[in-house]
Regions:
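An anion/phosphate-binding loop that grips the pyrophosphate of nucleotide cofactors and donors
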Residues: 38
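Short glycine-aspartate micro-motif
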Residues: 4, 75-77, 141
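Pocket-forming structural segment of enzyme catalytic cores
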Residues: 89-155
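Structural motif
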Residues: 42-44
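Cysteine-nucleophile active-site neighborhood
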Residues: 47-119
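Structural alpha-helical scaffold elements that stabilize or flank donor/cofactor-binding regions
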Residues: 34-35, 68
């Protein structure tokens, strides 16, 4: 069973429907025990970094998520669900993350680009991860975001 973590924000139903459509047993969960017992974890994300961290902490889910990752269970962080794995975010001042990965979540620099970044774009992938097996290298993905992760180790 894949645990889709409901921490009070996020696009839960669309993620759940996606898994069900491809025949994967995925359930929306709100407790640490369900995360511990799951074969993998999905943390969907829509909203502010600080609110996400506060909700995960208030619901006592942070430790279960970190332990699941440390055990090597598959983890899919969608947008904010990826960002909270990093050391900190500069959104609305500095806010500590789960520190699974060393690095920061930073706002796109002021340039001639529109922020938030919205629309269909390709990816510039340095090392192809297994999740992209069967997806063409020039595939398009939809984005709606104002921040990106800047890992300390880009490997």
């Amino acid at each position: 069973m894949i645990a889709i973590v409901d921490y009070g924000m996020g696009n839960l139903r669309s993620v759940e429907k996606g898994f069900l459509k491809v025949g994967v047993d995925a359930r929306i969960v709100t407790d640490a025990a369900s995360i511990d017992n799951a074969d993998g974890v999905v943390l969907p994300g829509v909203g502010a970094f600080m609110d996400c961290i506060k909700n995960l902490s208030d619901m006592k889910l942070t430790e279960a998520i970190i332990k699941s990752i440390q055990k090597g269970k598959p983890y899919l962080g969608i947008c904010l669900g990826l960002q909270v794995l990093f050391t900190e975010s500069e959104e609305f001042g500095v806010c500590r993350g789960l520190n699974v990965f060393k690095g920061k979540v930073v706002r796109f620099p002021k340039m001639d680009l529109k922020v938030p970044h919205m629309g269909w774009n390709t990816l510039n992938i340095k090392k192809m991860p297994p999740i992209f097996n069967g997806i063409g290298g020039e595939s398009y993905f939809y984005f709606v975001h104002s921040f990106y992760v800047a890992p300390e180790d880009e490997g």
